[in-house]
A protein has these predicted regions:
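Conserved residues at the C-terminal ends of beta-strands
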Residues: 94, 124, 204
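N-terminal catalytic cores of NTP/NDP-binding nucleotidyl/phosphoryl-transfer enzymes
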Residues: 7-75
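Active-site-proximal cofactor/substrate-binding loop regions of enzyme domains
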Residues: 46-61, 65-110, 115
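Short glycine/serine/threonine/alanine-rich loop segments
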Residues: 43-45, 88, 149, 187
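Single conserved hydrophobic/aromatic residue that forms the stacking wall/gate
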Residues: 196-205
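Classical nucleotidyltransferase
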Residues: 102-195
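Short acidic-hydrophobic, aromatic-tinged amphipathic segments that line or gate anion-handling sites
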Residues: 1-6
Length: 205
């Protein structure tokens, strides 16, 4: 399990961590990272981003055999590269599968968070976790209080009086509004892909 591997390799390093999808690494995500780095520098904590792969919406769409699956802004390799470019020390993903889907909030804390040397946890104000999204900030704050871990809630980051979100960026891209997408991402929208070509008749000669 990548958590056990991470803990074995980096267990001696105290962490400031956050959890989320971080699709596109937009302005709101960058604000969280900025705060993480500031606190981490002050308190001598390494920064860690935990995300799920695939995206939960993609997982549920596949389970329901939906043709139009949710479009992600960037693949996970691009996400990791941009996290590195933004000076995040560590990042790893949790495989979103039926096992993770069915985890209660208590199990998630026991099997994921408690295995990491987290001293400070930062989450978005809309963060939910565990089976049926039953875990929330108050649940994590109570866990943190009992384990001497600071749990902090990050307020909504807004632009044009609307919460910046990956969903909004996907909408702007789908509508062809790349200027808005660029403002929300704080960079030009790009994507990477693999191209497959069929051999030409000449290749068989």
């Amino acid at each position: 399990h990548n958590i056990d591997f991470f803990n074995k390799k980096f267990s001696s390093e105290p962490l400031i961590a956050t959890i989320g999808n971080f699709d596109g690494l937009h302005l709101g995500h960058k604000e969280i990272i900025k705060r993480m780095k500031s606190i981490g520098t002050k308190d001598n904590l390494k920064s860690l981003v935990i995300f799920t792969e695939p995206h939960a919406k993609e997982f549920f769409a596949e389970q329901k055999d939906l043709v139009d699956q949710p479009t992600r802004i960037s693949p996970w390799r691009d996400k990791c590269k941009r996290l590195k470019d933004n000076k995040v020390d560590y990042a790893f993903f949790l495989r979103f599968d039926k096992k993770l889907q069915r985890m209660s909030p208590e199990e998630f804390i026991e099997k994921v968070l408690s295995k990491l040397n987290i001293k400070y946890l930062m989450i978005g104000d809309d963060f939910k976790f565990g089976k049926e999204r039953s875990g929330d900030f108050d649940f994590l704050a109570n866990w943190g209080e009992n384990n001497e871990i600071k749990v902090d809630r990050i307020p909504t980051y807004s632009f044009l009086e609307r919460r910046v979100s990956s969903t909004w960026i996907r909408e702007s891209i789908a509508n062809g509004d790349f200027d808005l997408a660029q403002k929300l991402l704080d960079r030009r929208y790009t994507f990477s892909c693999l191209l497959y070509t069929s051999p030409s008749p000449r290749d068989n000669k």
